[in-house]
Structures are given as C-alpha cells and as structure tokens.
Amino acid sequence: MKETRPFSMKDKIGYTLGDLGCCCTEQFRAMYLAIFYTLVLKVNPVHVGILMLVTKFWDAINYPLIGALVDSHKNKGKGKFIPWIKFFAFPTAVLCILGFVNVSNFAYGARIAYMFITYIVYEIMYTCVNVPFGSLSSVMTDDVNQRTDLSRFRSLGGTIFMTVIVIAGPLFLYKDNQPVPSHFLIMSAICAVIGLICLMFTSHWCKERIITEPVVEKKEKFNYFQVIKDITKNKALLGVMLSSFIGIVGAGMVNGLNTYLFRDYFGNVAIMAVSGMLSVLWSLIAFVGTKFVAKKFGKKEWIMYSATFSVVVYAILFFFPLENPLLFIIINGICYLGVSGFQVLVWALVNDAIDYQELQTGKRNEGIVYSAYTFFRKLANAVSGSMSSFALAIAGFQVNEAVQNEAFSGHLWKTYTGLYVVGYLLAVLVLKFIYPLTKEKTAEMLQDLADKRNATTAE
C-alpha cells in the first residue's frame, strides 16, 4: 500500500462528514419513522413497538456478523473499511426513502408487511456502512489526542444534522399541529441524498494508516467464536457497552416521546424549532469544551461528573412540572451539556477498548469489537424505540384522535423526566464500577502497546 499523507484536518472533516452521512438517514428515521407510522399510516403504537423490537433485535444480531465479514476482508491497497462504505452507501439511501412512502391506503396487514420489509432491509444495508465507518477511526491514527479529536469531530457530524433537523422538521413536517404526509417523503429524500454525498467525501478524505492483517497461517480460518470469547474478557468494552446500553434506552425513550411532549403536553410542536436553534449554542460549547475537560479530568471521569449534574436537575423536574415550554427548553439545553460526554466521548472510549483488546490478545479485531459495541447500541435502540411506543399506549394515546386528553399529558411528563433520571443514573454507575480505563490507566495502556509494537519492529 502506498505511503499515505500524515493525519490532518482533512481526516477530521472527512470523519465528521461520515457521521453526518450516517445520521442523515439513521437519525432521521430514529426521530420520525415511528411518528410517521402512528400519525400518518395510523398504525397502533403497540404494533409499531413490536415491529421495531423484532427488527432491531435481528439487526443487533446482524452487526457482529457483518463485523466478522469486515475483519476477514483483506486490505488490497484500497483500505480495509473504505470499500464497504463506498459500495453500500447508495442502497442505504434508497431504502431510507422507501420507508417514508405513504401506504396508508393499503390494507392494515399490507401496511405492516411493507413497514417490516423496508425497515429490515434498510437496517442490513446501513449496518454494512456503519460497522466499517465506526472501525475506521481506529486505523486512522494511534495518537490518543488525535483519537479524542476524531471522537469530537464525529459527534459534530451528528450535532450538525440534529441541529438542522430539529429546526426544520417541526416547521416543514407539520401544519396546524398535524403531520403533512408528503413532506415526510420529501425530507427523507433530501436527507438520503445529502447522506450519500457526505459518505463519498469520507471515503476519499479519510486515510487508513494502521495496517494489521490477522496473524494466522494461510490455511487457518478466521475463528469468529474465539474472537467473541476474547471480547467477553475485555472489561473496557463490557463497561462501555453496558453503560451505553442503559443510557441509550433511557435517552432513546425520552427522545421518542419528545415530539409528543411538545405537541400534546405543551400544545405547540412548532416550538421545537426554538429548541433546535438553541441546540447550536449547547453543541458548540460541548464540542469546544469537552476536549479541555477530558484532557484535564479524563474521559471516564468527566462523563460521570457532568452526567450526575443533569440527573439531579431532572429529578427535581420530575416532582415540579413546568408549563412554560421556553423555560423547559433552556433547562433541557443546560442538562444536555451535562450528558454530552456520552455523545462526544463515547467513540474515544470504544477506541480505547480496541487498544485494550490488542493489549490482552495481541489482535485488534476492530470490526468485531466495534460491531460488538454497536450490537448493544442496536439492542438499546430496539428496546427504547419499542418502549417509547408502548409508553404512548400505556399513557392512553389515541391513534385516531387529533387532540389527546389531559390525563395522557400528565402521564407523559412523569414518564419523560423519570426515564431521563433512571437511564443516565444507571449509566453513570456502570461506567464507574465496570469500565477500568481512568486517565492514568489509559496512559499506561498506550505506553505498554507502544513498547510491544517497538519490540516487534526491532525483531
């Protein structure tokens, strides 16, 4: 493989665009697909919850399988991960659009079948993009500060998308507090095209620099089950997987209820656009400030300290409901700063877990380690997405009613704030007691790896 240029800002921007490209389809679907199913296709939220639980569970199982395929793919001069991103970006975009076709005139069973097919095929295509993209950062550099930068820049991609979609979505997708079916399809097409373009930039601007082919004999097969056994001993990976799982379940359920909170509790879904505009400020503060606080306190330490603050604030809100949506938006934004460490730094924790894997076994297995982590994220998304739909049904949401009753609104507030507290509190506790890589231990691990690599080179 020809010599590549040194790590630079071009790599960071390329990686940002990669996350933006992934978010353009995945996060748009995460935010609006369940809403589209219930408000446009008029599907019972219980059935939506079951559909998402089944398909996401399959998708979670699919992630390690794709990870194994990626790891078994040899670098033939074009990179180990880039070819996957290039090939599967287009079908991912197409399937995203098909998911928002208005089939409300279909028979109820046909609607369910269409939802199931488009949902699960999209997830397979997206997995073939997301696993290699997530693994890509671990082979772009082995410098700890550059990896932190990549994690920060990756979060910036998602932040850019969320900022735009949270502002534009409520203004474009709804009229008079009711959904406009054709606008969902239009916005999905816009997001899909932008996502495809961004991923093409990623495949050209990001360079793979750490080349570690599997150390096996020619006739030895890739032992998938041995790798799975190895990663179960990776305490760093287990810690970040469990912490993320719990946090995502809580936060995902909250996000799934967000539109209903503004639409049915505050009575104004369009005001979510104000939240989107203010999120630019919160995101910039988190993006700029996280680098310095993580360097000073350590990644694990900062995530725990700041998230605990947000948990306390939301615990107070649980007992003292707010009626002013603008006040809620401001308080929620401040709390976002507290939990932003989970978003901004989590991928740096995963990269550290890959190093921990190499330290323990001598093999990095980036694809499987990353996909194992993503397996738990997918399971969490499956649980949170389905549980959000179940929570709507339990709270008394009426799918055929344009305006919900007051009892539903009251239950919604308690559910929203309570899930936030429980989710992030448990995530912090798991990170504290299971994830072993403090600031000092991370430095020791990286030094040990450097010594081993130098010794191997000397031989």
Sequence positions of predicted segments:
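Membrane-embedded alpha-helical bundles of multi-pass transporters/translocases
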Residues: K2-E459
